A protein has these predicted regions:
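Structural signature of hydrophobic alpha-helical transmembrane segments
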Residues: 34-50, 94-105, 174
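Loop-to-helix transition at the N-terminal end of transmembrane alpha-helices
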Residues: 35-52, 56-73
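C-terminal ends of transmembrane helices
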Residues: 51-64, 111-121, 186-188
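Hydrophobic core segments of alpha-helical transmembrane domains in multi-pass membrane transport
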Residues: 22-28, 44-45, 49, 76-83, ...
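Transmembrane alpha-helix boundary signature
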Residues: 81-96
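N-terminal membrane topogenic signal
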Residues: 7-17
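Cytoplasmic-side transmembrane-helix entry/capping segments in multi-pass membrane proteins
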Residues: 63-75, 96-102, 126-129
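C-terminal transmembrane helix-loop-helix hairpin of multi-pass membrane proteins
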Residues: 5, 125-196
Length: 196
């Protein structure tokens, strides 16, 4: 697989949200706005890239029996680092995302890429895989957050452009399921036409 394909596969072919349906907890819970979705996606991307690099570099030294716990320790280290950085530089976003930042440790996207890709490939390829999957996750969370924000409150990225109240359901959990379902259908329809 070429270097460019390692990055682009996460955007379309192996999109974590719309194709693989991974990471649904943060996807549904943090996408009440485009900014929240983008922030969660970027936070996950940061951890994904760095953990892929380290896991790929040390994969040959990790015994099979402690492989998964070792991955969790590596991922938890980067999540802790991320928490410190976010608390220092973007405290408002850190407060908004709250509990979902520490939950990146057990996010199946990050663990899945460590197990399925990083431990079997080179450091460079693992970094590119992390970038691609992370960008795909970030884009899908941002789009979902944007749709929910527009329909739920009549704003985009915090800028109100529709007067009056939006559709309350889209700000709440049921709206997350509805918006995600429709976006999955649209994404799959568009990608199936592209494949033909």
């Amino acid at each position: 697989m070429g270097k460019f394909q390692l990055i682009t596969k996460g955007l379309i072919k192996e999109n974590p949200t719309f194709v693989l349906l991974l990471g649904m907890c943060p996807t549904l819970a943090t996408t009440t706005s485009a900014i929240n979705g983008m922030s969660m996606g970027l936070a996950t991307t940061f951890v994904l890239i760095l953990s892929n690099i380290v896991i790929s570099a040390i994969a040959t030294y990790i015994p099979d029996k402690v492989r998964i716990p070792s991955y969790i320790v590596v991922i938890a280290t980067f999540v802790t680092l991320l928490q410190f950085i976010m608390q220092a530089y973007v405290p408002d976003i850190y407060e908004t995302l709250g509990l979902f930042i520490p939950l990146i440790v057990v996010n199946c996207i990050v663990l899945g890429r460590a197990e399925a890709f990083a431990n079997k490939n080179s450091v460079g390829d693992s970094a590119l895989d992390g970038i691609g999957i992370g960008l795909g996750f970030t884009c899908s969370l941002t789009v979902l957050g944007l749709v929910r924000e527009i329909l739920g409150s009549g704003s985009a990225f915090g800028f109100k452009f529709i007067q009056g109240d939006g559709i309350l359901a889209f700000v709440l959990a049921p709206g997350a399921f509805l918006a995600l379902g429709y976006l999955i259908v649209i994404f799959r329809k568009l990608t199936s036409k592209k494949a033909e």
